[in-house]
Amino acid sequence: MSVKTAPQRRLRRRRRVRAKVQGTAERPRVSVFRSNRGITAQLIDDDSGHTVAAASWTEADTRSLPPMEQATRLGQMLAERAKAAGVDSVVFDRGGYRYHGRVRAFAEGLREGGLKV
C-alpha cells in the first residue's frame, strides 16, 4: 500500500535521507525543521549525539522578517555560531523537505555566512 498523505511522504523521505547523511565532530550535520511559521535548525555531532549550535525563527532579530529573508538570515546566524564553535564545513540534512524555497534560502544563508555545505 502506498503512502498518500504529505506528512507521511515527508517522513519516508526523511528516513531515506537520514540513512545516508551522518555528521561528525569536524563536519556536523545541519538538521532543518520547517513549519508554517518559520524555520529551526541545529548543528548536530552524530558521533557524540550533541548539538553544537542552533538557530530558530523565534529569536528577536528574525521574528519580524518575511519568510525568505528570515530563512536566509537564520542561515547566516547559524554560520556565525558554527564558526565560533570551530566548524568550517557541514553536511546538510534537509529533513525530507524539497530543496526549494525557504530550505534553499537557508542553505544559501549558510554559504553566505562562510560555511562549506
Predicted region positions:
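Ribosome large-subunit tunnel/peptidyl-transferase-proximal elements
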Residues: S2-V117
